[in-house]
């Protein structure tokens, strides 16, 4: 009897659990381990941030959903992966042996790389988790009483640019509904070499379409932007030219800011010898299998995918929902 353990209960971990359970016979066990007891639908976080959805509308309790399918669930953080011994060590010291491990943890949000950034002790917000979205909503309600400039965008080494654009237009729409948009200058600051690059070298006419829409919605932007630090009410940005030379230094004022951070691998995964690249992302082969450990597979944002192209300010390649689902299907069949 094989025991398959899945780390993570997000857009990768949950489909992995369901597909694995459906594919394997009842003689085999499937267990999901997650640091919290709920699933959050991350794509809805921008709506939570402006009050269009509540927390309760975008999360689900995991245990009953998995257990009725015969899938085990443990709501504890993993502190160590002992890949040689094929076991996990959980936050309470419990050891969980596995025959196969699927890593679908998502990323660690690397706010510490830019001094002064992040919602915990920093001066910027994020919509990468429902907790962060709720914090933006709480601060946004106070902001509406005395509005001012807003900055939205993505930090150097970010890879998930779509939600930054989405959030800019969501915030624009919400402010217009409130008849307050004219009181809120908006600046989009991104490490992309041009608007609509998206970490993909552009998608069709994304550059011209997004530039046009942003002009029509009175949004200014700074591209090739290397944000270096954030202070209360001020973002320090070095803008590079296409050759990587300094073009201009900006000090951008803001009253609220939502900047998507760079990602890294979570600590327990990044610490495993030979498993990951220097940023902690799992190195995999064409079968989604670890190059170092033949019984470890990985899917989602936590896998190592090279950038589509070299950019003056480093950018990463995004890993989207459908892409993650196909990774999961490959793991199950392999």
Give the location of each predicted region.
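Beta1-alpha1 glycine-rich phosphate/pyrophosphate-binding loop at the start
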Residues: 2-72, 156-200
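Internal hydrophobic alpha-helix adjacent to the cofactor/substrate pocket in enzyme cavities
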Residues: 173, 321-334
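FAD-site-proximal beta/loop scaffold in flavoenzymes
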Residues: 110, 119-146, 253-326
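Short amphipathic alpha-helical segments
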Residues: 17-20, 44-45, 113-116, 164-165, ...
